[in-house]
């Protein structure tokens, strides 16, 4: 692992409204990015219109089963102008689970002075008596089905945090978004990777300071972010497009967690923009997380699920799901990924050491990049700017920031 020059990505999301974004045609990057910041918001776009016409329910193509149950009828996949449905294996082969660095660059075009919704990131207190200087730094990564699974994966980073701060680091195994936010609010947790949708809760409730996201820094172009994929079984005859979720009886669709961006909040805002209203048009069942949603669809426990693309990619890579047995019927443009954060009361010297450990090292050749689909580089971000699309979604849903809304 080599030390590198710090890269700064203090960015700007375009000023388009959520409606403008979700209404973009999913086809080309050109107009989906345009003024709206491309990836960020157009989250409804990549597939917004393409899912409707390409997948539909496919009719029955001259047989008893509708065409969307036969992958040989699926359109050729073009990442710049995607049409659906598509096998998950096809999307993964094309690298469509992430966006490009150009998506992040588009977010940088119009920096914001303050968040559009909720409070600004808290400053470090002026009163030194309020600063935290613990012997051991408590660190937590966004909860998974097995919260301990990433402790050894992150060892190169944890070792560098110890080296740069002079503090020992304990990997805290927390099992929910609410537990993470509450632990930082009570200053029992000092460092955390908060999932995309939970970041504003952490900022507003726990005085978290998001400062960095992971990217794939290898190769010439690199990759950034993740997408919302709406998945169902290939052989599900009832669902071949987003519109097919409007069923009678209602389809049982898994949402990950109330505070999850791609697993709940974004679908509520963006699907409604396409005329499909969760809980009115289909039944919502909270699975507890993206892994659980993915496995639940694969095991026929749910009819469909909106999931984080990189999350299901990890489940597939671990051979828990056959990607040729699931299809994606709708996809978003890229969202920002997990935001790595520290509590604002952490001693300034420790804050700077933490930032060095994340931003001044190249982790591309480590277990971190291996586990996280090549994302072995951390870059600096500005919360108000890069999270603007997420805040647009949460504003449109009138989200209230309290830990009760983080409970499953």
Where are these regions (language model features)?
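Acidic helix-start/capping segments at beta-turn-to-alpha-helix junctions
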Residues: 174-185, 199
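Generic preference for hydrophobic
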Residues: 139, 171, 210-211, 230, ...
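Hydrophobic residues within well-ordered alpha-helices
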Residues: 184-185, 245, 297-298, 340, ...
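Short beta-strand and adjacent tight-turn residues that come in two discontinuous sequence segments
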Residues: 194, 211-213, 306-307
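Bilobed "Venus flytrap"/periplasmic-binding protein-like clamshell domains
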Residues: 139-160, 197, 220-295, 299-304, ...
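Terminal disorder- and signal-encoded targeting elements
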Residues: 1-175, 190, 200-201, 205, ...
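Short beta-strand->loop
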Residues: 208-223, 283, 317-334
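Small-molecule pocket liners
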Residues: 225-230, 336-342
């Amino acid at each position: 692992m080599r030390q590198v020059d710090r890269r700064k990505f203090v960015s700007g999301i375009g000023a388009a409204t959520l409606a403008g974004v979700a209404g973009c045609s999913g086809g080309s990057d050109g107009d989906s990015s345009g003024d709206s910041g491309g990836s960020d918001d157009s989250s409804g776009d990549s597939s917004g219109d393409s899912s409707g016409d390409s997948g539909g329910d496919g009719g029955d193509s001259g047989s008893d089963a509708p065409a969307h149950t036969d992958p040989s009828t699926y359109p050729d996949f073009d990442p710049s102008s995607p049409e659906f449905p598509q096998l998950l294996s096809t999307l993964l082969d094309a690298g469509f689970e992430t966006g490009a660095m150009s998506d992040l660059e588009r977010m940088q075009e119009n920096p914001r002075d303050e968040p559009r919704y909720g409070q600004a990131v808290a400053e470090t207190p002026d009163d030194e008596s309020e600063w935290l200087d613990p012997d051991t730094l408590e660190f937590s990564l966004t909860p998974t089905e097995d919260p301990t699974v990433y402790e050894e994966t992150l060892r190169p980073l944890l070792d560098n945090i110890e080296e740069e701060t002079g503090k020992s680091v304990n990997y805290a195994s927390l099992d929910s978004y609410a537990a993470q936010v509450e632990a930082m609010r009570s200053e029992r947790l000092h460092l955390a990777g908060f999932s995309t949708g939970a970041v504003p809760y952490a900022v507003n409730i726990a005085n978290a300071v998001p400062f960095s996201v992971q990217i794939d820094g290898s190769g010439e172009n690199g990759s950034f972010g993740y997408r919302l994929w709406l998945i169902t079984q290939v052989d599900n005859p009832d669902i071949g497009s987003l519109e097919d979720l409007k069923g009678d009886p209602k389809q049982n669709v898994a949402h990950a967690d109330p505070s999850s961006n791609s697993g709940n909040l974004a679908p509520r805002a963006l699907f409604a923009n396409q005329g499909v209203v969760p809980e009115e048009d289909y039944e919502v069942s909270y699975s507890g997380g993206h892994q659980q949603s993915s496995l639940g669809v694969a095991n026929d426990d749910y009819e469909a699920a909106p999931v984080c693309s990189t999350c299901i990619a990890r489940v597939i890579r671990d051979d828990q799901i056959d990607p040729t047995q699931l299809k994606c019927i709708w996809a978003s443009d890229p969202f920002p990924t997990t935001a790595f954060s520290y509590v604002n009361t952490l001693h300034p010297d420790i804050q700077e050491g933490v930032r060095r450990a994340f931003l001044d090292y190249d982790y591309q050749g480590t277990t971190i990049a291996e586990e996280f689909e090549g994302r072995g580089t951390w870059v600096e971000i500005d919360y108000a700017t890069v999270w603007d699309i997420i805040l647009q979604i949460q504003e449109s849903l009138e989200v209230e920031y309290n830990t009760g809304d983080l409970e499953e």
